[in-house]
Amino acid sequence: MTNEEPLPKKVRLNESDFKVLPREELLQRWKQFEAYVQALENKYTDLNSNDVTGLRESEEKLKQQQQDSARRENILVMRLATKEQEMQECTTQIQHLKQVQQPSVAQLRATMVDPAINLFFIKMKAELEQTKDKLEQAQNELSAWKFTPDSQTGKKLMAKCRMLIQENQELGRQLSQGRIAQLEAELALQKKYSEELKSSQDELNDFIIQLDEEVEGMQSTILVLQQQLKDSRQQLSQFQQQIQTSGNRTPSSESKDEGETSGKDCGRILNGPSNGGSSHQRTHSSVGLYREGSSTEEDFSASPINEGKLPNHSEERTSRGGSSYMNQLSTGYESVDSPTGSENSLTHQSNDTDSNHDSQEEKPVSGKGNRTVSSRHLQNGLDSSVNVQGSVL
């Protein structure tokens, strides 16, 4: 039976009903009464069960609250104990400090007996007496200078004080104005000085930029000259090899003339490293000269007349050509290593080579027949090569 179902009606029986009513009707009413009692009992049991669960839940909550409160109480008790301990420690420290600050009679006697403290107290007494004397003098002076409002001296003194105060204020204004003007002048000077510094800094920056450009140009020229020096050294080694081979093949005077011409060409190559094309042309001209010299050697090999005269003359010419060749090499290296003086060295060496060439042209060449013709052809070839090299330079 649930709460939603209606309760059965209550049956009431009297003694008269027991006597009057038949048995069947009594049984029926009795059953109704039993049903009513059963419904009440069920309802009571339901109510009891709900109350028990609620009471149990409330009991658990109360127990938990009691545990929490007990835990808090323990924590608070511990805190209280720690606070009391701290209070006791503080009181002991305060008592100790009081005992330390309150010296004993023995300490006071010891301090009074100390001579340094005695001297200190004597000085303090002397200073106190001096201050008292000064105070008395000041009070006496103040009482002497006192005057009534109607006294003429007091009025004059006040007027003088006002005038002095005004003069002091005016002097302060003048000093402040003069200081401001001085500061303005100094500020103008500093501005002018800063502008001059800025202009000088700009000039220095421009000068530094120019120097950087010049340095870059000089570095590029140095690199070019170093490359040309390397090329000239390679060409020089080639010419030396050619000279050695020609010296081994031709011990006659034509080999000496060839050495001189090749030395001149090498000197001109070293004197003019600024043009790569000219060095190439010079190598071709020297090779042509070498070929012409070899042809003249073949022509002169058949003439037995001048065999005795050739060795001495050729030795002299080769020694001269070798010395001039070494001088030209040294001057050429110096001119290439120093880029600033390359132009002067070029002009100087070109003049030297021209003078040597002219002096060698003036010397007579001993020979007959085909030898004189070949030497003339050789000199004409040298002249043409020198003219070509001069035009290139």
From Swiss-Prot:
What ranges does the record list as Basic and acidic residues composition bias? Answer: 254-267, 310-319, 354-365
Q: Of which family is this protein a member?
A: Belongs to the fl(2)d family.
Q: Which UniProt keywords apply?
A: Cell cycle, Developmental protein, mRNA processing, mRNA splicing, Nucleus
Q: What is its main location?
A: nucleus
Designated name of the protein: Pre-mRNA-splicing regulator WTAP
Q: Where is the composition biased (Polar residues)?
A: 272-286, 320-353, 369-393
**GO CC annotations on file:** cytoplasm; nuclear speck; nucleus; RNA N6-methyladenosine methyltransferase complex
**In which compartments does the protein localize?**
Nucleus speckle; Nucleus, Nucleoplasm
Tell me the classification of the organism that encodes this protein.
Answer: Eukaryota, Metazoa, Chordata, Craniata, Vertebrata
Q: Which residues form a coiled coil?
A: none
Q: What does this protein do?
A: Associated component of the WMM complex, a complex that mediates N6-methyladenosine (m6A) methylation of RNAs, a modification that plays a role in the efficiency of mRNA splicing and RNA processing.
> Per the record's keyword annotation, is Cell cycle included, yes or no?
yes
Question: Corresponding gene?
Answer: wtap
The scientific name of the source species is Xenopus tropicalis
Region (Disordered) location: 240-393
Could you tell me which Pfam families the record lists for this protein?
A: Wtap
Subunit: Component of the WMM complex, a N6-methyltransferase complex composed of a catalytic subcomplex, named MAC, and of an associated subcomplex, named MACOM. Component of the MACOM subcomplex.
Q: Out of the domains of life, which is the source?
A: Eukaryota
InterPro entries, A to Z? WTAP (IPR033757)
The record's Gene Ontology biological-process terms are:
mRNA modification; mRNA processing; regulation of alternative mRNA splicing, via spliceosome; RNA splicing
Is the keyword Cell cycle assigned to this protein?
yes
